[in-house]
């Protein structure tokens, strides 16, 4: 057999307790349908992901105008297709119900599209391929939403990755991919079985790491970020949904 694709040469940690998801970990390439149907979350580190290559595209993100403050920068696009040949779907508002998002639910949020140059990068294609592999969707027919988000932490403004609080996104799968953490504290990713229960997962995702979440069974949240020095800090992530 030939060498496996680079994005599958990784250690995948199956869902477990808070701060220790899966203990020593289990090597996993392609989950079966039955295993996927039963999963809550999976944590993975992508090997040799060139996160620096996407930095210029995060530096060029516009301010999210739908929340108070200027700490969140954001783009959003919808796609079908393979990672190397994504088909951009018609531009649409991003709308969530008020039951899902109590902060911005019911608002037609019109975010700028992801830049064409980003789609051509191997690192970005690896992120998309990993999401497809572990969600087991058919990318030719299933719509993928891709949010590109930068949170800025400054001395004058706290960075809130999830100002809506503990929530679900209203999809089957959510993939949170950490691309960059620079000069910040906080930004822990939490997963919950219910909003009024302690988290079952609590971890700071490091660059190259991502967590796949069953959005039907779990809620998620990310804590506020603060700068660790005099200069602004940033947290860059891709959030993929299907």
Functional labels for PLM-detected ranges:
Residues 1-101:
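N-terminal auxiliary "cap/dimerization" subdomain that precedes the catalytic jelly-roll/cupin core
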Residues 64-76, 135-149:
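Short glycine-rich, low-complexity/disordered patches
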Residues 75, 142, 171, 185, ...:
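Residues that flank catalytic or metal-binding motifs in active/ligand-binding sites
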Residues 76-82, 147-149, 178, 214, ...:
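Structured loops at beta-to-helix junctions and adjacent beta-edge loops in soluble globular domains
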Residues 78, 165, 174-176, 210-212, ...:
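Conserved hydrophobic/aromatic beta-strand scaffold that supports enzyme active sites
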Residues 85-145:
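Signature of the catalytic double-stranded beta-helix
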Residues 138-206:
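Catalytic core of non-heme Fe(II) oxygenases with the double-stranded beta-helix
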Residues 188-242:
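Catalytic core of Fe(II)/2-oxoglutarate
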């Amino acid at each position: 057999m030939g060498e496996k694709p680079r994005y599958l040469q990784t250690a995948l940690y199956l869902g477990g307790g808070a701060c220790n998801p899966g203990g020593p970990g289990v090597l996993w390439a392609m989950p079966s349908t039955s295993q996927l149907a039963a999963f809550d979350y999976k944590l993975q580190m992508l090997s040799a992901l060139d996160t620096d290559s996407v930095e210029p595209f995060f530096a060029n993100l516009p301010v999210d105008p739908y929340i108070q403050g200027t700490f969140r920068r954001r783009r959003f696009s919808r796609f079908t297709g393979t990672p190397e040949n994504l088909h951009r779907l018609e531009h649409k508002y991003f709308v969530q119900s008020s039951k899902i998002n109590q902060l911005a639910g019911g608002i037609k949020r019109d975010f700028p599209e992801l830049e064409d140059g980003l789609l051509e990068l191997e690192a970005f294609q690896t992120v998309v391929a990993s999401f497809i592999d572990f969600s087991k969707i058919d990318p030719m027919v299933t719509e993928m939403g891709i949010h590109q988000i930068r949170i800025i932490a400054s001395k004058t403004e706290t960075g809130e990755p999830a100002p809506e609080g503990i929530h679900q996104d209203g999809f089957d799968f959510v993939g949170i991919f950490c691309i960059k953490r620079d000069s910040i504290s906080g930004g822990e990713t939490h997963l919950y079985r219910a909003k009024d229960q302690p988290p079952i997962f609590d971890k700071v995702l490091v660059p190259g790491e991502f967590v796949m979440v069953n959005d039907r069974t779990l809620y998620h949240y990310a804590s506020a970020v603060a700068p660790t020095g005099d200069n602004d800090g940033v947290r860059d992530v891709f959030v993929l949904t299907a």
